[in-house]
Amino acid sequence: MMTITEWENHSVVLSKSFGGVGLVKHFAVIGDPIAHSLSPVMHNAGYKALNLAADYQKFQVSPEDLGEAVLGLKALGFSGWNVTVPHKETILPFLDELTEEAVRAGAVNTVKVDKGRLIGHNTDGSGFVRSLQEHMELDERQQIVILGAGGAAKGIAMALAPFQAQLCIMNRTPERGAELVGKVLEWGGQAHQEEWGRGAWLAQADCVIQTTSIGLKKEEYPFSLEGIRPGALVVDIIFNPWETPFLQEAKALGCKIVNGIDMLLYQGVNAWEFWLEDKAPVESMRKALYQALTG
C-alpha cells in the first residue's frame, strides 16, 4: 500500500514507460481499513492483459479525512476510484451527480471524474446480479430468499427488483426487514417479509442468498437450511473462507453453492466498464483474483 508521495514517484516512472507523463490513467480504492483489498490485483491484471497505460492503487482514508482525500484524488488527476467501508454513504455530499444505480442503492462504491465533475455510481448490486446470472435465469418465476437486511442485502435486493423476481426478506430484526421490503416495492419490485428461518418458504426457494457477516463458525450462525429443496442455488457473499459453514451445510443438503468471489469480480468489472467505456478482460481479472485467494 503506497503513500501519496510514493504514488507520485511511481506515477512519473510509469508514465515515462508509456512514452510520457500524462498518458497514464490512474485509479484507486479508498477505505479504512484497506490493506486487505484485492481490487488492485484484478484491475492491474486487466490493464496488463490489454497493455493499457493505467494503474490502480489502494489508499487508507480515515472518515475524518474523506473530504480532503476526494479533493486530493481529483487534483492529482485520478480518472476514478472505488469506495469501500466506511465511506459508501458518507461520500455522497462530496459528489456532483449520482447514477440511477447509486440513487437506488443509497450508496456509492465507484466514482468517475468526467470533465471535472464527480459522478457517483454503484456496481455492488449489478456485480452480484451479473455473477448470479452465470448460474440461473432471473425473471418473475424465480423465488429468492435474502437473509439479512443490511447494506449488502439492500444493494442486492434493489438490483434484483427490476427483474420482478419474488423476493423474500428474512431478518432477525423485523423492522429492518420491513424497511427493505418497502424500498423494493417503492422501486417497482416484488418483495415480502417472512419470519427468520421459516422453513416453509425455504422449501419453495429457487435461490437463497446469505448477506450477513455472521456465521463464519457454524455455532455462531442462528439459521438452518433444513427443509430447503435439493438443487436450489445457495449463495454466501463471503469468499474467505472459500466454503463457509453455511455453504457446507447447503452442499450436504444437495444444493448448488456459490461464494462471493464472483460478486467481487463483477463489481470490479462493472466499475472498469463504467470508467473506460469498454469491455473488461474478465477472465484475466478472474484468474488474478482466484490466484491471490488460493495461492
What kind of region is each of these model predictions?
Residues W187-I257:
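Rossmann-like adenosine-cofactor binding region
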Residues A232-V282, R286-A288:
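Rossmann-fold NAD(P)-binding glycine/threonine-rich loop
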Residues V24, E140-Q143, P230-G231:
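Phosphate-coordination loops involved in phosphoryl transfer and adenosine-cofactor binding
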Residues F163-L185:
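NAD(P)-binding Rossmann-fold cofactor-contacting core
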Residues G31, G120-N122, L132, M136, ...:
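Glycine-rich adenosine-cofactor-binding loop
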Residues E6-E8, V13-E137, P241-E243:
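Phosphate/diphosphate ligand-binding glycine-rich loop within oxidoreductases
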Residues Q57, C168, V258:
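Conserved beta-strand positions in the Rossmann-like core of class I SAM-dependent methyltransferases
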